[in-house]
Design a protein with these regions (language model features):
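C-terminal helical cap(s) of enzyme catalytic domains, especially alpha/beta-barrels
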Residues: 1-23
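A mid-to-C-terminal "edge-of-domain" accessory segment
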Residues: 18-144
């Protein structure tokens, strides 16, 4: 059985279907299905998986903000999902600078390197996950 989320998105975006699929309810529909069946979808599932629009911070995040379509051909809001950014041991200097900015700290090269090194030395993987709402996205872009 083909997955509903992928098929409906393909019909809408790639085949320009004249049908009015309500893609914005796909994530809610997936969660409802999970509640009834007690079958959790894989985190890596496209469209509705918990990692579908999750991005590690750093240069990857900078690229997402410059040109989201390069990494996300289907916008997260269109399918009821949202973009999330993750800070942790892979953040790097750029990611650390973004984190400092979001926390209201003055970001400089030395501070960003120190934060990146501290995150890496903790060796705890992903430490902070933040839903990237419009307000935060604008702040990151303005603070470049």
């Amino acid at each position: 059985i083909p997955p509903l989320a992928e098929v409906s998105v393909a019909f809408t975006y790639f085949y320009k279907s004249p049908h009015d699929f309500r893609l914005y309810i796909l994530l809610d529909l997936s969660k409802l299905s999970e509640d009834y069946t007690e079958i959790k979808p894989y985190d890596s599932n496209p469209i509705v998986g918990s990692s579908a629009y999750k991005h590690k911070a750093g240069t990857h995040l900078a690229a997402i903000l410059r040109n989201p379509a390069a990494y996300e051909p289907i916008p997260p809001r269109a399918v009821g999902n949202r973009r999330r950014i993750v800070f942790g041991e892979l953040a790097g200097k750029t990611g650390a600078a973004y984190l400092m900015s979001l926390l209201g700290l003055e970001k400089d090269d030395i501070g960003a390197k120190a934060v990146a090194s501290g995150l890496k030395n903790l060796r705890m993987g992903d430490l902070i996950e933040i839903p990237l709402e419009d307000r935060l996205e604008k702040k990151i872009i303005e603070d470049k």
